[in-house]
Amino acid sequence: METSSISTVEDKPPQHQVFINFRGADLRRRFVSHLVTALKLNNINVFIDDYEDRGQPLDVLLKRIEESKIVLAIFSGNYTESVWCVRELEKIKDCTDEGTLVAIPIFYKLEPSTVRDLKGKFGDRFRSMAKGDERKKKWKEAFNLIPNIMGIIIDKKSVESEKVNEIVKAVKTALTGIPPEGSHNAVVGALGNSNAGTSSGDKKHETFGNEQRLKDLEEKLDRDKYKGTRIIGVVGMPGIGKTTLLKELYKTWQGKFSRHALIDQIRVKSKHLELDRLPQMLLGELSKLNHPHVDNLKDPYSQLHERKVLVVLDDVSKREQIDALREILDWIKEGKEGSRVVIATSDMSLTNGLVDDTYMVQNLNHRDSLQLFHYHAFIDDQANPQKKDFMKLSEGFVHYARGHPLALKVLGGELNKKSMDHWNSKMKKLAQSPSPNIVSVFQVSYDELTTAQKDAFLDIACFRSQDKDYVESLLASSDLGSAEAMSAVKSLTDKFLINTCDGRVEMHDLLYKFSREVDLKASNQDGSRQRRLWLHQHIIKGGIINVLQNKMKAANVRGIFLDLSEVEDETSLDRDHFINMGNLRYLKFYNSHCPQECKTNNKINIPDKLKLPLKEVRCLHWLKFPLETLPNDFNPINLVDLKLPYSEMEQLWEGDKDTPCLRWVDLNHSSKLCSLSGLSKAEKLQRLNLEGCTTLKAFPHDMKKMKMLAFLNLKGCTSLESLPEMNLISLKTLTLSGCSTFKEFPLISDNIETLYLDGTAISQLPMNMEKLQRLVVLNMKDCKMLEEIPGRVGELKALQELILSDCLNLKIFPEIDISFLNILLLDGTAIEVMPQLPSVQYLCLSRNAKISCLPVGISQLSQLKWLDLKYCTSLTSVPEFPPNLQCLDAHGCSSLKTVSKPLARIMPTEQNHSTFIFTNCENLEQAAKEEITSYAQRKCQLLSYARKRYNGGLVSESLFSTCFPGCEVPSWFCHETVGSELEVKLLPHWHDKKLAGIALCAVVSCLDPQDQVSRLSVTCTFKVKDEDKSWVAYTCPVGSWTRHGGGKDKIELDHVFIGYTSCPHTIKCHEEGNSDECNPTEASLKFTVTGGTSENGKYKVLKCGLSLVYAKDKDKNSALETKYDMLIGKSFQETSEGVDGRVKKTKGKYVMPVEKNFQETTEGVDGRVNKKKKTRMDNGRPKKKQRSGRDDNQTRMQVELQEGNINSVIMHTVKNF
């Protein structure tokens, strides 16, 4: 017997450079597919597990991780649902611990802290998945360590194509720093032998990762590429390795120039020397004079004017230093072409208008960081056999340093020759405060800041990872104006004390810890300096909030940030506690463990007559604020951000108060809130979140003054009946979801882009709806009073998504032309005629009891990719579907009898995955089933051709699947058996260059007709035995059914599942290594049925089948050549159904001796027909065969051959054989 294919990995494992760890259901067909393509275009060999239901067995995947050099760990929302992802992550951590793997974490629409600390739904899914698993602790360690590596963040504002390029660049950079396997500089060798890669008698250089840095810098200085004089700036944060890089550059390049000079420590020298000494020092180095004078430069100028010079200036810190050297720099630029000047600084602004290009020194990658740390931690004993015992602790220090070379050097030196107990103790101390030697490095840059910049730096540390606009707004309302705040952020960015990424302000962890240390030192001195309090132990003492030691210290408290999740005991707050805090700007009582901030038990006891005279407060966050209103003495004159979720408030404050700076208000789930009158003067308000304020009935008319309001969330305000007439010109997002008493929607802004009216009581849209020319999303789901959609909706030229699900009384959809409409959801409506919109890509008509047929013109909807017809119980037939349709879901169409012939047009070049689902279509006629199977066969054949032609079958993936009621394996499957297991023997060269994919089939029966499931998946695991008797297992999906939207359903009838997957990667490797060898292969297949993540014992595989699919030979002119694998055995069964479906199948058997020549049939355009044999087995016994006449068939063969129907000719030939 014979089967599909897979190559062995034990014999010749593929040398993958990059392994991608990701959750397939989230990212496979979007982000990851683009990333894989980009990596391959850059000649980077990448491995991914290609199947959603887990393609490879875990041991194979773990082996792939070990064989890889780099891992991309992509954390997405549903990552922790998969135990496979987490076990891969555990392996990744182990390999990085051993120093054999570089991990690059990618946070896909997640915060790194969410992953690291397992917060929110991400953490909830992990705890649910890992419940009761003894490996939970190890997994948590992996989540704690891997996300701490400097990674790449992709949020909602990111342009994914740009992020893909950034990842590819990071991978290429990492690969260049990884020595070839077997070289002396490989990580394993470097960790085991301090002399690896060094010449005899030479001490190994104490830095790592400089080779690629030097190469990148040299590219910017290239004398062949850039003929003129060139000035390059080398920039980066303090301690990042600029000085080391420049010394290496100078050492390498000085021999290329007749005159060269290196002036280092310019920052320090400028403090002890007059600035006019700098040009004298430089000129002296260039001219080789001991005491040159700038006043008399004629001789040095004339001497050097015709020479190419190299000048390296290190640690430039002020504009005055540049100005002092300007005359000489200008002279160099005017001199002979080919000179090079390199200026290193930690202040990017100093290079503006001076340099031709800039090189930014980045953090070290994980591998270089580990090597550098180990070099200094074991500097006198590199061959220490106990080094492996320190590996886990080493990882902790490396993660702490986050690729910062100086920190790695300092920490390694402090731990050299120390015991493991000392290492553990040091790690605990670092959690409290950074090393003084690290602090001193940053202190130099901090001391050079102005007072305003220092305050801005320390304030930003309190709000890192927040939007830049938000941070600048907080700073602008402090001692700085708007322009000054923006200038402060830019200055700190230029000095690399902060950085902006995707619109957010970030700060390196070491700088963040440094900022806290600065505040702590300020408190421990005389108490006269303003400070910010982060640690709860500094805020709460003895069961009371006791920040104050005296009035002077209270007056200098600038911020209080209390994490309520860390408050274990009941704590009392005195009514006069804040009375002396006149300078308090930031007050936050929050919960870091619950992002939605809803589960906290409020352990802070607050008196009713609390005094809150906080005139200077800019940010007020108080989770579950217990009072009905803010105290009367509260003055919001400088308030920018007010967040009081789940509060007991009825109104903000009594009367009107000036709020000229207020921009963000969040009062979500304040269920007693009934008045918003306090916001009547908040004319600069931009975001207002009132979700879940169930008592709120109306908006004040004064809110029409909010001309800057862009976001208004009223979701779940169940008492809200209407909105006042107003024109909020900046409003872009309006959410009224679940406002069940809201009856009439007035047009309150012409600029709305996203409008959510789902679950409201509105019965019609406003008459002037056509004014919403920027509207992109309109959601009216579950508007049960809505009876019609006005034709003027067709005038909304920007509308892309229209959701009308469960609008039970909606019977007619107007004939409109919305040229950009991509998504139309009409499920649960009473519409009788399907609308035809040429641009629609996703159309949902499910749960419609009125539609009995679909329009024939649907085949012309070339953009339609997803058609949902689930539970359309009156639907009796479907017409031909368009060629680009990727998913058809007709589950539960109980009246469906017929389908079009052909079912859908197939484009010869299409490569998209497609799924056609007909589960629980109990009245489907036999002719319809035969057309579905015929379509599946044609689809497999054309897909094999397209994949081979357009990507050479490089990427293995599931390309087509279908399922429908039935009990037989289609006749075009070459191998069939009863039961769930199939054993085959494949002939020599079965894996030749034309093998494109594998077609699989399983007949599944439900043992308990009353059983209900939400998901059903059929997978096939097959093992291939090669000539060395080793087995390789490979798993791929056959087909699946999922009940979307929750709930469960019965699968009562037997169902046929057919799936086609492109050639697996392991087969490709086997093919490349053994294409000329003649090796028979044994294979076995096992089909299983799972519900969710575990095998479902209530479902049984009755029959199964296999066919290998081959693409046409590129040297032939036929449109397609399909060849079938054949069996070495005694049984024979023919295939007699052509591609066009016109030839009916017959079954039978011949019992033939093994020594007979059984040859496969492959028909080309030259008309030559070779013999082919095919076998069908029933429990290992051959079935009986009835022979058919040959004369009519011979005539038909000639006609078919003339018409180019090659596959029909093949089937006839086999039949007559």
UniProtKB/Swiss-Prot annotation:
The effect of residue 49 to A is: Loss of cell death
**LRR repeat segments:** 581-606, 614-636, 637-659, 682-706, 708-728, 729-749, 750-774, 796-818, 819-842, 843-860, 861-887
Q: Give the GO cellular component terms, alphabetically.
A: cytoplasm; endomembrane system; membrane; nucleus
Q: Which reaction does it catalyse?
A: NAD(+) + H2O = ADP-D-ribose + nicotinamide + H(+)
> What is known about what this protein does?
Disease resistance (R) protein that specifically recognizes the AvrRps4 type III effector avirulence protein from P.syringae. Resistance proteins guard the plant against pathogens that contain an appropriate avirulence protein via an indirect interaction with this avirulence protein. That triggers a defense system including the hypersensitive response, which restricts the pathogen growth.
List the protein's name: Disease resistance protein RPS4
Locate the region Important for interaction with RRS1: 33-34
Keywords attached to this entry: ATP-binding, Cytoplasm, Hydrolase, Leucine-rich repeat, Membrane, NAD, Nucleotide-binding, Nucleus, Plant defense, Repeat
Effect annotated for changing residue 139 to A/F = Loss of cell death
Question: In UniProt terms, what is the effect of altering residue 34 to A?
Answer: Loss of TIR domain homodimerization. Loss of TIR domain heterodimerization with RRS1. Loss of cell death induction
